[in-house]
């Protein structure tokens, strides 16, 4: 089994604490609301939202991915860090055993934030994961982040 790493970062005009609260802590409710064309539902199928919780994300009709199940590994409210592992779903295919993501939101100069994502793709057997496959996960996260960001810009009184 090989492990393939992918790192990316993006910026947001939303302050780190507010973005963490909306995107991570309330993502189960907010993401389907702000991006129904991509995600139809996010639900905890096991646990209360903390470490060990299993979440099921169901993607909207027409998406190449039907669903994924993620296990929450860590939520650090002080350092705005969220670690989770994709453990099930057609996104894994026959190449991947799991995908682990570490997401950290840090304050950026000027009041916005920097979102840093580090992903580890754990391949089954001798399969290899190419850059395009790894980039797809980042692009989906970026789209969801931008939808949350737009919502927060339009609803300035929420998630403060």
UniProtKB/Swiss-Prot annotation:
Coiled coil: none
Keyword Ion transport appears in the UniProt entry: no
SUPFAM superfamilies per UniProt: Bet v1-like (SSF55961)
Keyword Zinc-finger part of the UniProt annotation: no
SMART domains assigned: Bet_v_1
BP GO terms, sorted: abscisic acid-activated signaling pathway; defense response
GO cellular component: cytoplasm; nucleus
InterPro entries: Bet_v_I/MLP (IPR000916), Bet_v_I_allergen (IPR024949), Plant_def-hormone_signal (IPR050279), START-like_dom_sf (IPR023393)
Keyword tags: Allergen, Pathogenesis-related protein, Plant defense
Source domain of life: Eukaryota
GO molecular function, one term: abscisic acid binding
Family (UniProt): Belongs to the BetVI family.
The protein's name in its UniProt record: Major pollen allergen Car b 1 isoform 2
Organism: Carpinus betulus
């Amino acid at each position: 089994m090989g492990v393939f790493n992918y790192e990316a970062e993006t910026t947001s005009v939303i302050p780190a604490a507010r973005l963490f609260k909306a995107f991570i802590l309330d993502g189960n409710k907010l993401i389907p609301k702000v991006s129904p064309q991509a995600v139809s539902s996010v639900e905890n199928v096991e646990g209360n939202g903390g470490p060990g919780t299993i979440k099921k994300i169901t993607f909207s009709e027409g998406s190449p991915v039907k669903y994924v199940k993620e296990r929450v590994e860590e939520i650090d409210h002080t350092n705005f860090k969220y670690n989770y592992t994709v453990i099930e779903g057609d996104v894994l295919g026959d190449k991947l055993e799991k995908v682990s993501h570490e997401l950290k939101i840090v304050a950026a100069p000027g009041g916005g934030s920097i979102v840093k994502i580090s992903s580890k793709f754990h391949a089954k057997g001798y399969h290899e994961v190419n850059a395009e496959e790894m980039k797809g996960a980042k692009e989906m996260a970026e789209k969801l982040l931008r939808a949350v960001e737009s919502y927060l810009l339009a609803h300035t009184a929420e998630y403060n």
